[in-house]
């Protein structure tokens, strides 16, 4: 027996598993700490993101307030800016041809809206409206509200204060103060007191008013403008100012009917009115010049008398 080989039955080394390395525990500890650090980092980032979102939402109202300050204060409701009248904000139904004609007139006249075109049409028909109703196109409620707000301001009608007066004494020029229909709204005068008859039958507007005796020559009506008074126009009736019933004017009927005849202003009557206005202006200017000349002569005469008295006193 070999004394050197004492451990014959020793297990070979390849059958034994190798011992674990010493650095493996350190690696596992590092991995575990890394996982823990990652888990710790995730909620911190979420919290940071949440804080950022909250801070951004806090800044948004500040930006809005700054924008509002730059744009200026908000305008209040403009519902009460205009005159309060009955029927305001009400829709008006009209025939299709009439609406189409108003739309066409708005484009032809260069108005901004159809309301301005309707206002223009009322302005053109002011004499007819006054003769038929006894008041102008401005509603009585608007006149009352404007008179209550400002006593010194008097709202005129759309035709520069067209005035009509009736001489109860039989047409004499020295009558009372003429009624201003544009300002007074025809107070004290009803429709029955005015002669009937202005508009003939027009399709779509019902039966017309009989046209007999419209402001006859003997009734003593006068027409005038503020600052002028033309008694001579009293011999002209509104029927002569407005075209007769048989004057067919195609294209001026607002497309309502080809047979209906709407009262059309007669240019010859307005020519006569303009001539009388010119004569009245000339007479007024002559009176003013005569008055000024008379005052100048009196002043010169007084100065001459003073000079004579001073010369005699010396």
Curated annotation (Swiss-Prot):
TM stretches of this protein: none
Single Gene Ontology MF annotation: sequence-specific DNA binding
Region forming the signal peptide: none
Annotated function: Transcription factor that binds to the site II motif (3'-TGGGCC/T-5') in the promoter of PCNA-2 and to 3'-GCCCG/A-5' elements in the promoters of cyclin CYCB1-1 and ribosomal protein genes.
Record-linked Pfam families: TCP
GO biological process, one term: regulation of cell size
GO terms under cellular component: nucleus
Keyword Oxidoreductase recorded: no
Subunit (UniProt): Interacts with PURA1. Interacts with SPL.
Biased composition (Basic and acidic residues): 38-49, 77-89
Disordered: annotated span: 1-91, 295-314
InterPro entries: TF_TCP_subgr, Transcription_factor_TCP
Domain TCP: from-to ranges: 78-132
Disulfide bonds: none
Name of the molecule in the record: Transcription factor TCP20
């Amino acid at each position: 027996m070999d004394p050197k080989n004492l451990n014959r039955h020793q297990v070979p080394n390849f059958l034994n598993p190798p011992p674990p390395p010493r650095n493996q525990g350190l690696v596992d500890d590092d991995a575990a700490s890394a996982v823990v650090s990652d888990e710790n980092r995730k909620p911190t980032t979420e919290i940071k993101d949440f804080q950022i979102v909250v801070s951004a939402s806090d800044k948004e109202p500040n930006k809005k307030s700054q924008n509002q300050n730059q744009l200026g204060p908000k305008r209040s409701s403009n519902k009460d800016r205009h005159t309060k009248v009955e029927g305001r904000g009400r829709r008006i139904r009209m025939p299709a041809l009439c609406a189409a004609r108003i739309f066409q007139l708005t484009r032809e006249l260069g108005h901004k809206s159809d309301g301005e075109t309707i206002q223009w049409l009322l302005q053109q028909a002011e004499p007819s409206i006054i003769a038929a109703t006894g008041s102008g196109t401005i509603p009585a409620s608007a006149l009352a509200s404007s008179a209550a707000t400002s006593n010194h301001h008097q709202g005129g009608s759309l035709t520069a204060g067209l005035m009509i007066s009736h001489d109860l004494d039989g047409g004499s020029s020295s009558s009372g103060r003429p009624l201003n229909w544009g300002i007074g709204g025809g107070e004290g005068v009803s429709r029955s007191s005015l002669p009937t008859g202005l508009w003939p039958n027009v399709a779509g507007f019902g039966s017309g008013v009989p046209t007999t005796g419209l402001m006859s020559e003997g009734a003593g009506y006068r027409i005038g403008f503020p600052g002028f008074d033309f008694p001579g126009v009293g011999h002209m009736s509104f029927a002569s100012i407005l075209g007769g019933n048989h004057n067919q004017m195609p294209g001026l009927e607002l497309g309502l009917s080809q047979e209906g005849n709407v009262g059309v202003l007669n240019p010859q009557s307005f020519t006569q009115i303009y001539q009388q206005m010119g004569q009245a202006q000339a007479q007024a200017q002559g009176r003013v010049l005569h008055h000024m000349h008379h005052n100048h002569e009196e002043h010169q005469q007084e100065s001459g008398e003073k000079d004579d008295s001073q010369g005699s006193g010396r």
